[in-house]
Amino acid sequence: MTDTVDRTESSGSGGSGLDSFFKLHERGTSVGTEVRAGFTTFLVMAYIIFVNPSILSVAGLDGAAVAAGTALVAGLLCVLMGVVANYPIAMAAGLGINGAVAFGLVLNDGLTPAGAMGVIVLEGLVVLALVAVGLREAIMNAVPLALKRAIGVGIGLFILFIGFVDGGLIGHGDPDGPVPVDFIFPNSMGAWLTLTGLLITVILFARKVPGALVISILLTAAIGLIIGFTTFPDPFVVTPSFATLGEFDLGNVFSQLGFVAAALTIFSFMLTDFFDTIGTATGIAEQAELAEEDGTIPGVGRLLFVDSLGAVAGGAAGVSSNTSYIESAAGVAEGGRSGLTAVVVGVLFLIAIFFTPLAQIVPLQATAPVLILVGFLMAHLIMGIDFGDFEEGFPALLTIMLMPLTFKITVGIGAGFVMWVLIKVVKGKAREVHPLMWVVALAFLIYFGQAVLNQAISA
């Protein structure tokens, strides 16, 4: 793939401790590049500091405490990911899961906020157990190479789609029309800011300017301040509150929901966490050229271990499940190749604990152009998929398309896995299917049929 920097650049740190620990020279990167990549990733995902509280406060949680807790947990997990796994993957509270916690578990199912966080802790413990016995890594290694590449492409299109949505260029279509989304003609200040940012991003990237992505974000954010789209917060320094730490309850989950309903709920959250991370890790490793030729990821066990702590830590801190972020691809596009990138992101999150209001001066319209470009960069993996082979091409296509169309990574992965197994069976090649692929396909059938199961339980 094409990077914004020359990856043959000298590490500039020779035999230093950082170079040796993070294998910078071996991976064709440098301290400066990693720091720049870390800043880029942080800027692209800093929105979670104010978005997570806005969602969880609906469920009755204290917004200021959630903001501080979000930055704290994300910071610690990012540092841990960098030091333990040495991958340029950042972690923070997962969007989607936090919405399911607030609107699903609390407002719909009637759990207390502490009880909802208890569900997150329980599903995190299940995932942690699966990592401990090696099942999560074994499943990753059992996935066919074509589907691994399809996952990377699908995540790229998902990121690109997020960029268009965040930038205000794509939105809800005519409710009476044939499609649920539509192009929004730039008739707002936000949309024009996105287009301006995209122009800046394209020019800087095409000219191979070092730091193109982080420069683009900062310039676009500055333009937003100048034209009055955003305002400088007052105050911008706050005394953090950590009132949500330890606010989780494991005791009443099964009694309030019933055993079967609680088990299905935990299973659903677990499956989402489990395969979202597999998808993100696969896509980022491929983009960073850290995966082997057969698609396996060296040292993935350590990566999965740290990620599996995210749900437990997020639930225990009362800020919802933390997971590996697909926005890490922005830092990789900036040249990040090691865990030092993640450490930089973590340090910035920890600093942000005292400056949480400042996150709002970098609007989504400033980061949307970078996401659009990153989506393009990840699309190159599609060249490794043989669409002339129906067995390989059709499941791959489902995986690629359903991620952005459903706005869910797990749905795309599940559809591709189930279709892969189905086609092998109908062609008399069932013996070619890895045993774990059978298990995963069955799990996804249960996942897709969960609505029917819930109706049967409530009937």
Predicted regions and their residues:
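Helix-loop-helix junctions within the multi-pass membrane cores of secondary transporters/permeases
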Residues: S16-N52, V73, G94-F103, L107-G152, ...
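Helix-loop-helix hairpins and the membrane-proximal interhelical loops
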Residues: T2-A65, V179-F183, I215-G301, F444-I446, ...
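Residue-level signature of catalytic and energy-coupling elements of molecular machines
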Residues: V35, I55, I139, G211, ...
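Hydrophobic/aromatic residues within the transmembrane alpha-helices of Major Facilitator Superfamily
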Residues: F39-A46, L76-V79, V83, L160, ...
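Membrane-interface helix caps of multi-pass small-molecule transporters
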Residues: S54, V79, V83, G104, ...
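Loop-to-helix transition at the N-terminal end of transmembrane alpha-helices
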Residues: G60-V79
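Juxtamembrane transmembrane-helix boundary signature
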Residues: A74-L95, V126
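Membrane-embedded alpha-helical modules
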Residues: D109-I226, T230, V343-A459
